[in-house]
Design a protein with these regions (language model features):
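Gram-positive cell-envelope targeting signals
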Residues: 5, 52, 90-93, 176, ...
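C-terminal flanking helix
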Residues: 18-21, 25, 246, 250
Length: 285
């Protein structure tokens, strides 16, 4: 068995056992989940890194979603995923209580999952650092406001392990899950590529998360702040896995530094000229 196959097997087995043991913990049958550890420090990730898309690609895709007569109803949600970096399971788990429009805060404290059996479960965030409060930008605030105001009122208000008032629900009133959005993104990208000659790469909810992190890194967000926003327990995960800065970014940084140096020289030159002028005036006096 290859290293990649071993890694995938371990991840698959843990993915099955972790939620099962978590249910035992929730039912007070166990004190601690033995599979609650993070794989980052246990196995080396040999899979190909899922790349972020560029800001230009993101904007083109969002415009397509906004203007398309089929996918326009998903625009607010997709915009939020691109501009908050939330995990899709965190987004699907959001309830009305988690969205503070008055103070413009998103309270992320759980995630929703659905098993093959069809049973729904409310789980803790992926790591303890995943429990966090995210501030809303003006645009993200407007997206959430629209979702809340247009939330269907004719669907049943289901309760999952004490949680109710889910923001995004399916036709039966159940909270939507990651699989819903994986399929939507897949079909939306296919529709985009059927229309436009310049093809869009594969986009998933997780690509949205990668893209958000990379865009924040390009904007020179403080690394510790970015770690908090992403909900990572280790900053190395933030910087090594979720940032995809390349040659163009390096060129932009060199240009930026050159512009800063030129501006600094110009300021120094102005200051010298000012000092000379003042000295001349004093001599004249």
């Amino acid at each position: 068995m290859t290293r990649i196959a071993v890694t995938l097997t371990i991840k698959t087995v843990r993915g099955v056992l972790r939620p099962a043991f978590q249910m035992a913990v929730d039912d007070d049958l166990l004190m601690k989940n033995p599979f609650g550890f993070e794989l980052v420090g246990v196995i080396y990730n040999t899979e190909k890194t899922r790349l972020a898309i560029t800001r230009e690609q993101m904007n083109k895709f969002l415009k397509f979603i906004h203007d398309d007569n089929i996918y326009c109803k998903y625009y607010e949600a997709i915009y939020i995923l691109f501009h908050t970096g939330m995990r899709i399971s965190e987004f699907c788990g959001l309830t009305l209580k988690d969205i503070d429009l008055e103070n413009r805060i998103i309270d992320i404290n759980h995630q929703v999952q659905r098993f093959r059996s069809g049973k729904y479960d409310i789980c803790p965030t992926k790591t303890s650092a995943g429990t966090r409060k995210l501030p809303m930008t003006e645009e993200v605030y407007q997206m959430f406001k629209s979702l809340v105001e247009n939330r269907p009122t004719d669907l049943p208000e289901v309760i999952v392990k004490g949680y109710a008032g889910f923001l995004i629900r399916d036709k039966d009133g159940m909270p939507e899950v990651a699989l819903h959005w994986e399929h939507r993104f897949q079909h939306a990208v296919k529709r985009y590529n059927d229309i436009y000659k310049i093809q869009m790469p594969s986009i998933t909810p997780h690509v949205c998360r990668h893209t958000y992190c990379s865009n924040q890194a390009r904007a020179r967000k403080n690394p510790k702040t970015l770690q908090y926003l992403m909900g990572h327990s280790e900053i190395s995960v933030t910087m090594d896995i979720y940032t995809h800065l390349g040659l163009d970014d390096a060129k932009d940084e060199i240009i930026r530094l050159k512009e800063l140096e030129d501006a600094r020289k110009e300021i120094n030159s102005i200051e010298r000229d000012t000092m000379r002028s003042m000295e001349s005036q004093f001599k004249y006096i």
